[in-house]
From Swiss-Prot:
Gene3D superfamilies: 1.10.286.20, DNA helicase RuvA subunit, C-terminal domain, Elongation factor Ts, dimerisation domain. The keyword Protein biosynthesis applies. The gene is tsf. This is Elongation factor Ts. One of its GO terms (molecular function) is translation elongation factor activity. It comes from the Bacteria. Pfam families: EF_TS. Keywords: Cytoplasm, Elongation factor, Protein biosynthesis. PROSITE patterns: EF_TS_1 (PS01126), EF_TS_2 (PS01127). Associates with the EF-Tu.GDP complex and induces the exchange of GDP to GTP. It remains bound to the aminoacyl-tRNA.EF-Tu.GTP complex up to the GTP hydrolysis stage on the ribosome.
Length: 270
């Protein structure tokens, strides 16, 4: 068996963030092999975190952006969310997503970040910090993009992030990104709204009109009006502009010479 010194234990503790006794036992089991000992600790602590975290929610966190990538990284508390290690890891993961052009969580988890995968980086971060940490969402767009990030409080990292892919003038795209952050549209055009959802909204609007005792001959028109109101809530191009309330977002974008091709909006906890 290798001779394990206090310096060896300290070195492994600094490397993994595990307790002194866990580090000593891992080094003994690995016969002094640091790489093997670190892996043993990661497995052991990872199992403990999984057991403890099964019923815990990672409903805090932040949104980070890099180039054409937008990433949400979740944790349990805002205290961890604003910590330097968590913020730095989120930015590194966003950088990795942009470089690899990774547009979904599983693909991003497999991307190499130094000598580890992104998935392993997230696991190690959870072990070091001691909270449930999850890679929540990721989006990647190829074309020209603008990003807009919003903080809920000055001392917290961004909790809302928007990524807009566009053609034409950048200024219009920036305005659209702010609109998306504030008004939470779910679709770009009404054609993107699933047919079953439109049918359900139409059914609700019609039933509401009848319950209110509206004249039968007026129900069809009232229903269409209410359905148009629904579209104004959920469709970006049909929303009233937050900067020019008498105009739709589409009208403002047309005047700016901007076409929004697609967008992503991530909000921590939503």
């Amino acid at each position: 068996m290798a001779n394990i010194s206090a310096a060896d234990v300290k070195k492994l503790r600094e490397l993994t963030g595990a307790g002194m006794m866990d580090c000593k036992k891992a080094l003994e089991e690995a016969d002094g092999d640091f790489e093997k000992a670190a892996e043993l600790i990661r497995i052991k602590l990872g199992k403990k975190m999984a057991e403890r975290g099964a019923e815990r929610e990672a409903s805090n966190g932040l949104v980070a952006t890099s180039g054409g990538a937008l990433v949400e990284l979740n944790c349990e508390t805002d205290f961890v969310a604003k910590g330097d290690d968590f913020v730095a890891a989120a930015q590194q993961i966003a950088d990795a997503a942009d470089e690899a052009k990774a547009g979904d969580v599983e693909a991003l988890k497999a991307v190499r970040l130094g000598d580890k995968t992104v998935g392993e980086v997230v696991e190690n971060l959870a072990i070091t910090i001691g909270e449930k940490i999850e890679l929540g969402r990721v989006a990647y767009f190829d074309g020209p993009v603008v990003a807009y990030m919003h903080k809920r409080a000055a001392d917290l990292p961004p909790a809302v992030g928007v990524l807009v892919e566009y053609d034409g003038a950048e200024a219009g795209a920036r305005g659209a990104a702010m609109q998306i952050a504030a008004m939470r549209p779910q679709y770009l055009t009404r054609e993107e709204v699933p047919g079953d959802r439109v049918a359900k909204e139409r059914e609700i609007a019609e039933a509401t009109s009848r319950e209110e005792g509206k004249p039968e001959q007026a129900i069809a028109k009232i229903t269409e009006g209410r359905l148009n109101g629904f579209f104004k809530d959920v469709v970006l191009l049909e929303q009233p502009s937050v900067t020019e309330s008498k105009k739709s977002v589409k009208a403002v974008l047309d005047e700016a010479g901007t076409t929004v091709k697609r967008f992503a909006r991530f909000e921590v906890g939503a």
